Amino acid sequence: KSKNYRAIWISDIHLGSSGAQAEHLLEFLRYNDSNYLYLVGDIIDGWSLTKRWYWPQSHNDVIQKILRKARKGTKITFIPGNHDEGARTFLGITFGDIEIKNETFHKTARNEKLWVIHGDLFDEVMQHARWLAYIGDSAYTFLLWLNKWFNRIRRLMNLPYWSLSQFLKLKVKKAVSIINAFETLMVREASRRGCDGVVCGHIHK
């Protein structure tokens, strides 16, 4: 039986890359509905697709499921990230009942105002050392590939899914300090906009 929520936020799915967990997302979308659905960037991995075309049926099914939700009345907002930044060309346009925006604001049931943005525009590496971001992306893609095979072995042993890439990232002191600095910056920016909180993606946490 489906559960219904006021709002659901999804980010950093990276459809078009072999590391995308499309089947898990599809399962989630089947059994969870909402009045508002925010796609908070990096839904499609344009960087990966330009290197190698990868688009299995499960990735197509996710897109179709999202479009179906929009047709059935879910108010969907797509906020592009750095991996699907090509969509920023269409800001302000509604595509298949999905509104494309650079950022938006969500009012909670408790009347709290949340700032919703992907976050890459506030990432120093993305803005000033883009080449470094591409190198980091290649390393992360390899980690996701490793993660996939690692979890296949875990499934054979009847063990639950466990994110190796997330574990390693949180164990590296430098990565932790960068993540903490990013989170502090985003909270400060949200406050500057008169918001009670921020919902963002980008750092995969």
Region locations from a protein language model:
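Charge-rich, low-complexity amphipathic helices
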Residues: 32, 51, 88-92, 153-157, ...
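A sequence-composition feature that detects small, non-aromatic residues
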Residues: 7, 20-22, 70, 87, ...
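Active-site-proximal loop/helix segment associated with metal-binding centers of metalloenzymes
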Residues: 117-182
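Core catalytic region of metal-dependent phosphoesterases/phosphodiesterases
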Residues: 3-6, 10, 15-110
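Conserved beta-sheet core of the metallophosphoesterase superfamily
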Residues: 96-103, 111, 115, 120, ...
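N-terminal short leaders/motifs
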Residues: 46-70, 154-155, 164-176, 189-198
